[in-house]
Amino acid sequence: VEIFSLHAPGLSEYDVDRLPFSIKILLENLLRHEDGRKVTTADIVALAQWSLNPLAHGEAAGDAAKEISFSPERVLMQDLTGVPAVVDLAAMRDAIVELGGDASLINPLVPVELVTDHSVIVERSGSSESYEQNVAIEYQRNLERYELLRWAQNSYDRFRVVPPGMGICHQVNVEHLARVVFETDGVAYPDTVVGTDSHTTMINGLGVLGWGVGGIEAEAAMLGQPTSMLIPPVVGLKLVGATREGVTATDVVLTITELLRNHGVVSKFVEAYGEGVGALSLETRATIGNMSPEYGATCAIFPIDQVTLDYLEFTGRPQSQLELVEAYAKAQGLWHEPTAEEPIFSEYVELDLSTVVPSMAGPSRPQDRVDLPGVHRAFRAELGREPKDAIGVDAGASLRDGAVVVAAITSCTNTSNPSVLVAAGLVAQRAVERGLTTKPWVKTSLAPGSRVVMDYLDRAGLTQPLDQLGFYLVGYGCTTCIGNSGPLFDGISDSVIANDLSVTSVLSGNRNFEGRIHPDIKQNYLASPPLVVAYAIAGTVDIDLTIEPLGIDRDGVPVMLADLWPSDLEVAEAVRASVTPEMFTERYSAAFEGDKHWQAIDVAQGETFAWNAASTYVRRPPFLENLSPEPSIIEDILDARILAKLGNSVTTDHISPAGNIRGNVPAGEYLIDGGVTPVDFNSYGTRRGNHEVMMRGTFANVRLRNELAPGTEGGRTLKLPEDLEMSIYDAAMRYAIEETPLIIFGGKEYGSGSSRDWAAKGTKLLGVRAVIVES
């Protein structure tokens, strides 16, 4: 096997050995793709002497900031962002055929894996039938999208689809898809990935360099185009010591999120090193990598070591792959030796793991970590008044400010880690033994990121106690973490709105922005799975679980959290006895086959997609219609009108929302005209394959304020010169009839966020020729 050696004679004059591992991976990537055009010798030299660059010493780079072309080896997609990418590729095939070309020329040139995980919604919960009911609803709503994916699965080369119900893309990536090291045509090289989801960084825990990109960048990578990037600064995160008894991986990652947010790591790589690295399980490393977007880093990579190899073996990777990974990592200086000389980093941050304490984060930002005893104080500080009650929940029970109305064990961030899930099961088991139940207003759910989770919970005898507390399986997907929490229990929303209550959610997710989990929930707290169970029993966050009982047992004895919390040894022994390599091998042997619903989908044949003119989910986009072989000429913008004048921090979600569609907005009116009932509107995210919905949804976020229409929210503007107030979409269509070009003005931080492609496409479809902002 050949390699592009980082110790080649041409690099001997540079201190390559002390480069950060992440920079070494980038350097190998440039060496392998050098062509004198996209990647030049000057690019390679600039990266090889990274330690001499001002960036390496935490200084402003100035002219030293150099752009390079990085070529990822594969692309990972989820369905909300993946479906519009497939739509674009299908439209490219149509366009090339119309120009007299061969449709088969439009094919991915690198492996692409799309995991269908973002569409399942917790419509049903609290019963053994919840899972099947939610799956049936998911397929009924999303059949048109899934028909497209089935066609793509059969039509494209190097394109694989993991059907619904297998898990969350990042967890599936860590447990099965990631190679760590590739071998192709006798050449070995590092596995690198870009993904259409910001939490693609979870794979960093496995020593794989990767991060999230927009859909358009992912499409370019699929078609063999490199990703342009500035040579990054790298922050060294030195880990020392080991966690104390009772501290979970969630506590560690919330502490790191707070630490790195305060330090400042935006647009920087983070790389873990130090003797504490070896004390962390692979799953904990993956959890830390996963939350890179929350602390602002491009990625947060861990080096390859024996822990990596043990995990690869445990999850069913073949012995030959393990040997390749070890040999390659050691040959290229990518193997972590705690006693080796430290790499050179741009900046240094240190965390003593023994200082981490049980934590949560909230009420509205992942970096707002709170020690467990302080959660009730954080709630009251945000509330800003004395808590009040509202009567009328389940036979007279009292709903109060601080009530936990959603308690969700969810998200790839935590459900990839057997230790915290087993701990949750043990807490549930002890609670049931004491006769405790969850409060009647708490909507409980369990949505693992992998089918393996239910296998080992079953084997450990922990599924039943979780069920008894209402944590029934509701789906294998993102669910509550991305806002797919479904409706609250009957009467809860009405009571919350009528009494202006500040109710809460507790979830094992990664984001807790206001309004994200459910529009009627004002405060959201991130917590480990065992704490999710505890708060479901307590029913409120207005409590100090370290000194107050979370319930009274059947004998009238107060039950403290400490009475239910398992020891680290108990958790470790339960994990060791219940999680087996065979579970991973068996579950992933059919990763791409799908269930009976998937198999029953009628698969279209042919190299071009048969568009359904009646579809409200998938439409041929207009971007590639009537193309000419030559690029069009860019014309001057004359006699333009301002469509919107926006303020600061207008995110991609303000520009192109992903959430619910209301009936009284242009997108809702379009769907109603198409025969769709409001209950089946689904979300903007699931409608990203239909440009008609998406252009109507552009600038339609309910919280968007346009200074042209003061006093309004939700995508309103003034049509000029008539000064008529109307929706931004309706105004844009009137301007289009008048052939008037449009301009958007904005303040600072315009367009921050993820899912950038429709924020750009939708704006263009409205006839906007330029966006002028401060930053």
Where are these regions (language model features)?
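Long, structured ligand/cofactor-binding scaffold of large enzymes
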Residues: 35-239, 249-254, 358-361, 375, ...
